[in-house]
């Protein structure tokens, strides 16, 4: 365990990482919360889940494709004039469309998650859920078990889902074709797939780690941190805050976009 601490100190003090003292202290404090000694065991099923999170992007895309016509489909069908001129067309009906989109999106995505998680666990068993992540790599800083890591990252993935649903609804309210919605949405979701980080610091890398595709990847072995003045946040916390804010911004804009739509 002394060797582990030496590795961590060497890693944090690597010049190329350009970590501030506050960031180093943040990671040292987190590492001090890791329970020792480590208990070893079998964890194959959980490791597969953690290493395959990015595949959920395809489920996320499928959900967004389904809800893309929620507003733009009305424009294409010419029913927008009827809906918007109705008594509750600009209020309750618009809200109902948004709520229905989120309920469908959450339920459909959850079904994908259940299938995606059950397959490796059925094949390799549930063993290892309570084991420390450090048995995979001793320098992992997060003081979590495999199950805790899966749940934390899954929470972030759901926030990404909600933000992307909000973006889809906003685009649908603003564009007259569902195809145009997807033309904008697909690159946002999948261009990061073809971009690779060259480190864990610098504007390029820190931005890349926050894009939708990369935000589904746990990156539990990387010391990715964001310093905002005197505040230091790890990747999980930063992603959660960012996508929660985006969701809160997108929803009223989507509602307003359909409400203000000019029938033509």
Model-predicted segments: where are they?
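Transmembrane alpha-helix boundary/hinge residues in polytopic small-molecule transporters
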Residues: 78-79, 166, 182
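Transmembrane helix irregularities
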Residues: 86, 174-175
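Terminal transmembrane helical anchor/hairpin motif
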Residues: 126-148, 179-182, 187-261
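Residues that define the loop-to-transmembrane-helix transition and helix capping
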Residues: 91, 178-179
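Secretory targeting signals
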Residues: 3-74, 95-174, 194, 220, ...
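Short helix-to-coil transition segments within interhelical loops
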Residues: 84-90
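Membrane-helix interface linkers and caps
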Residues: 75, 81-82
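Hydrophobic positions on the alpha-helical face of helix-turn-helix-like DNA-binding modules
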Residues: 80, 93
């Amino acid at each position: 365990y002394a060797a582990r601490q030496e590795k961590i100190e060497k890693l944090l003090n690597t010049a190329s990482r350009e970590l501030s003292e506050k960031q180093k202290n943040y990671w040292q404090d987190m590492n001090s919360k890791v329970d020792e000694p480590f208990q070893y065991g079998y964890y194959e099923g959980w490791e597969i889940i953690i290493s395959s999170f990015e595949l959920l992007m395809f489920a996320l895309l499928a959900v967004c494709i389904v809800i893309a016509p929620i507003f733009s489909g009305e424009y294409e069908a010419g029913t927008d004039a009827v809906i918007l001129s109705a008594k509750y067309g600009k209020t309750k009906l618009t809200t109902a469309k948004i709520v229905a989109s989120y309920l469908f999106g959450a339920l459909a995505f959850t079904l994908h998650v259940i299938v995606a998680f059950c397959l490796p666990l059925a094949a390799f068993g549930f063993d290892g859920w309570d084991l420390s992540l450090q048995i995979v790599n001793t320098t992992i800083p997060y003081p979590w078990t495999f199950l805790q890591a899966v749940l934390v990252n899954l929470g972030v993935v759901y926030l990404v889902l909600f933000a992307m649903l909000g973006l889809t609804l906003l685009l649908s309210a603003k564009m007259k074709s569902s195809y145009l919605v997807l033309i904008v949405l697909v690159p946002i979701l999948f261009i990061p797939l073809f971009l690779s980080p060259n480190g864990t610091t610098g504007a390029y890398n820190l931005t890349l780690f926050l894009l939708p595709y990369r935000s589904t990847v746990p990156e539990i072995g990387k010391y990715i941190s964001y310093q905002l003045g005197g505040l230091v946040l790890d990747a999980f916390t930063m992603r959660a805050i960012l996508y929660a804010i985006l969701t809160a911004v997108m929803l009223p804009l989507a509602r307003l976009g359909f409400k203000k739509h000019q029938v033509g």
